[in-house]
Amino acid sequence: MSSLPVAAVLPELLTALDCAPQVLLSAPTGAGKSTWLPLQLLAHPGINGKIILLEPRRLAARNVAQRLAELLNEKPGDTVGYRMRAQNCVGPNTRLEVVTEGVLTRMIQRDPELSGVGLVILDEFHERSLQADLALALLLDVQQGLRDDLKLLIMSATLDNDRLQQMLPEAPVVISEGRSFPVERRYLPLPAHQRFDDAVAVATAEMLRQESGSLLLFLPGVGEIQRVQEQLASRIGSDVLLCPLYGALSLNDQRKAILPAPQGMRKVVLATNIAETSLTIEGIRLVVDCAQERVARFDPRTGLTRLITQRVSQASMTQRAGRAGRLEPGISLHLIAKEQAERAAAQSEPEILQSDLSGLLMELLQWGCSDPAQMSWLDQPPVVNLLAAKRLLQMLGALEGERLSAQGQKMAALGNDPRLAAMLVSAKNDDEAATAAKIAAILEEPPRMGNSDLGVAFSRNQPAWQQRSQQLLKRLNVRGGEADSSLIAPLLAGAFADRIARRRGQDGRYQLANGMGAMLDANDALSRHEWLIAPLLLQGSASPDARILLALLVDIDELVQRCPQLVQQSDTVEWDDAQGTLKAWRRLQIGQLTVKVQPLAKPSEDELHQAMLNGIRDKGLSVLNWTAEAEQLRLRLLCAAKWLPEYDWPAVDDESLLAALETWLLPHMTGVHSLRGLKSLDIYQALRGLLDWGMQQRLDSELPAHYTVPTGSRIAIRYHEDNPPALAVRMQEMFGEATNPTIAQGRVPLVLELLSPAQRPLQITRDLSDFWKGAYREVQKEMKGRYPKHVWPDDPANTAPTRRTKKYS
């Protein structure tokens, strides 16, 4: 094994790891970086603690762990183990854990210091999956703030060194030349007049006739794999096995595809891009590359993912071709013109730029980061995708302002997709928990093709679903409980309320509660039902309507009875074009779907406004335009009543405001004739109208919205209902302030969140004088080294404040 190419750079790599917290390793496929190097690092005395090896794909993780254990003459679970969703194989003596991406994130969240871990290896980092980017950001944060002794090795076959070196300029780069046999690369564009499946099958069969050895065929997705397999079956001899390989196959079926062909047989492995890098497939010397891939692109406008078939990057073509030269000289046939291949993008677009970021945002909030820009990213998450993620988390009740709510914290602790996590934590008893766990297991690994009825899938006892649901129940700390199909609809409705659907035609078309269209095959048995919940949707490429992949038929009356919180009641006035008059209607709605309509007598202006006020009372104050300024004014009034009770402050709790809408809101509703118009109202001014001029002055004086710090900066005070008021300010701007600022006639000290020059929290205190005299010394010592260009005086209480560095002070 020491003849492996990566062995030649082992001394250089070990020296780099001894000297630097992060090291970059570029080593082509087959160099031994996954299946040999980790054991050498395990034996290195400079690595103190366990090694965590991240593999992006489950099959690769298990295979790598199996191979590493074999080299030690052991089984997985001894020195080498693995962890992945629904499968753990580790023991008390395990020192090297091979894990998949989500598992690593959970490990970091549960133990931010990664206690007992000396080295984390990110393998196949060039794939730039969303979870790998998140893991890198979290690990760099851990190194910076908690574990400066933790080592990080980032390795890949086609490492984007330029980008990584810009982000990690001090990280040594170790390059292994690798070892591969020459691969003859041929190009053959597919005939325009021939069906894709037929043309690929013909080209593959011809390659098998001309050349010896087994063949790896790259296709965009499962549909193409199944169709090309069918076409190939009639074009090849009995000595050729056809083996599909894609992510949704069971691990056992995937393993069959990578094992050697039986004696005297050849095989064709029909694979998606799962086979590009991390898997060793025995006996391959021929590659046929269709030069296409299917990628998921998230649409933040609809909240849905669209599958796009596109040309692969040049890096992917190189990787695919390289599979033919792992064991002997090989041939790679790219089904594309050479000129087109040369015009392809150099690298694939990272997932973080085109994915649903709701899970990432929830992970960051659990980490304590409300602003993703504070983390280190190779590519910043798109703002529009983050806003869509925030909207979803708000809908699921996971947010409280800019932080996770109590429910959001429970959701984040599970590590599931946010919708599934919301469903799981909503379970009120063991039976509901068992039902939610089984639904989550099905939606995580849905049945491929076939029946779209979730109820039918729920009735099946598929082992993988059973195993996964048991794992989820363990996380929920639930023992016992029976999965009950009658509980599916209300559980789904809580997490997928926007995907409740009502039929709008006889051809399988539906409207969703969020206003979007969706479609079932007209021959699907579910399409006969008026109401569905469709948790699994895919944005169509040829139609604006989403495609329903999995749905549950619903008795809407029963659902409304069991989940009254889903229904909004609104009184509206509409023109009746036929009569030329106004008519009033009371609608019971779920989102944009009307459940029931009842006519009302023609209202007067006063009746219209009263109906609107009733609508506000039914829906709650959230239908109003609560700007941050209005929210803070309300909190100031709530706090004033507690801190200065001797004055007659108006009550502004929900119940009181709803009861007094006629007093404070109605005077501002002139000309407002719709619920939409309510959104244009200035709630800040409406609330200030509750105070006379004298009380307004008292509020602004005693509980000001801003505090002027010694530098003259006016900084917003953050008021909270149950916590002291807080002021986040850079420490240098508070120099010269000897005592802690107070408000409310000196009764309430401000909580000072003293920030570093980079706006990171350094200290939280309610006693500034005590801090200057005590804990400041430790902060000063650390910050002088980290921010030498900034002022860190010995006597901050008597030093002039500044916003600037020493150069300008």
From Swiss-Prot:
Superkingdom classification of source: Bacteria
Enzyme type, top EC level: hydrolase
NADP is among the record's keywords: no
Gene3D superfamilies, A to Z: 1.20.120.1080, P-loop containing nucleotide triphosphate hydrolases
EC number: 3.6.4.13
Binding residues annotated for ATP, in chain numbering: A27, P28, T29, G30, A31, G32, K33, S34
Span(s) of short sequence motif DEFH box: 123-126
Domain (Helicase C-terminal) ranges: 195-368
Molecular function per GO: ATP binding; ATP hydrolysis activity; ribonucleoside triphosphate phosphatase activity; RNA helicase activity; single-stranded RNA binding
InterPro entries, alphabetized: CON_HrpB, DEAD/DEAH_box_helicase_dom, Helicase-assoc_dom, Helicase_ATP-bd, Helicase_C-like, HrpB, HrpB_DEXH, P-loop_NTPase
Region (Disordered) location: 788-809
Keywords: ATP-binding, Helicase, Hydrolase, Nucleotide-binding
Catalytic reaction list: ATP + H2O = ADP + phosphate + H(+)
Domain annotation Helicase ATP-binding: ranges: 14-177
NCBIfam families for this protein: DEAH_box_HrpB, PRK11664.1
Similarity section: Belongs to the DEAD box helicase family.
UniProt name for this protein: ATP-dependent RNA helicase HrpB
Source organism (scientific name): Escherichia coli (strain K12)
